[in-house]
Amino acid sequence: MADLTAAHTPPPPARLLPVAVLLWLAGLYLRVPILVAPPLAPFISDELALSQALTGALTTLPILMLAVGAMPGSLAISRLGPRSTLALAMAVMALGSSARALATDASSMMVASAFMGLGVAMMQPALPALLPRWLEAHHLALGTAIYMNGMLMGEFIGAGLTLPVLMPLFDQSWRATLLAWSLPALLVAGALYLPRRGTTDLVTRGNWLPDWRNPLTLQIGLVLGMSGSVFFGLNAYMSNLLAQQNRLDLLPDALFWYNAAQVAASLVMLKMARRWMGQKGIIITCAFLCLLGTAGSLLLKGWAFIACVTLASFIAGLLLILLIALPPLVARAGETGRLSAGNFLVGYTVAFSVPMAGGLLADATGDARHAVLVMLGYGLLALPLTLVLNLQARR
């Protein structure tokens, strides 16, 4: 009984800083290994003779794995506990990402990318499941904001520092650059055992599959899919939309502000975490504003277009954090990982499928705006779900 009590005792306030650092670093590696691929893609493609489809798969395949790997993550949490699952997942991610640096052909590159994506996918439900073990109830919202800040900073850092900073340091070698991003994750995985929370994870042998009878599994997942569809979709079709306006010269500015908006969203949530997280009214407002910005991108051009997609990105970032914070706040004890895994399974399946369906329609019609219309249509269908969310804690 004493061991079980120790396993649930949160760290004293003096130790919250190292816990926060570990959460931030783990969050960073939710996105860095995925988003270093786009800036390195031309170098990888030239050396390995990748087709355009395979070059795109360097980024899209790991995103698809975010949905596929949610269930293995939930299973691991139920058998190993959240901390050991997170450490294992980070090791899988680091080894898979490092294997990409050693790939000799397209096949080995795709296998390594899928393996890396599996590790990232297993990390996702492990982080929210770990929060109640490390933090007191009134710190759960802040803990979520911290690791989500790390994740969104990872998007900005991975895309922004790879070419101007790391490539010159490693003699323009994409292989060495990938290793430099990947291997430090093994140190973070080992450091997860430093917080003195007992020597073992408390594990349960209950059902690890999503509880489809719990309406929050689908409701949160489908709204999460709306946020992901908007962010990944607008990002994917940004160049096509600007080219259709004959303003492709604005693409660097558009991408900068689009990605910077996600960082700004994470900083806002660090400040507002306790006041906003778990509040249905905030979620409803963010979902509406996200769709408003998306709709504006269809109607406006030039810098007004950039303002609209930047608004959509900023609000999508807020909505992402608000939704991912819900399982630790509302799930029963021991059910956090299960609910999170179901949300990620649904959310990332939608986030992958809806923009792809929009792209197929845009290819058929020759109008890039039709891709955005598909995302907007899905968002309007998902919006009423925010009105029926039951966010009462179930402990």
Please report, for each region that a protein language model flagged, where it lies by residue.
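Conserved MFS/SLC helix-loop-helix module at the cytosolic interface between two early adjacent transmembrane helices
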Residues: V68-T104
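A late C-terminal transmembrane helix in Major Facilitator Superfamily
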Residues: V330-D367, M375
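Helix-breaking motifs and short loop linkers at transmembrane-helix boundaries and internal kinks
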Residues: A49, G81, L102-S107, L299-K301
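Cytoplasmic helix-loop-helix junction between adjacent transmembrane helices
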Residues: A112-N149
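C-terminal transmembrane helical hairpin of 12-TM major facilitator-type secondary transporters
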Residues: Q279-L323
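Helix-loop-helix hairpin linking two adjacent transmembrane segments in secondary transporters
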Residues: L142, I146-L194
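Extracytoplasmic gate region of multi-pass secondary transporters
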Residues: P38, L216-V263
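Cytoplasmic membrane-interface "Motif A"-like loop-to-helix N-cap segments
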Residues: R79-A89, R274-A287
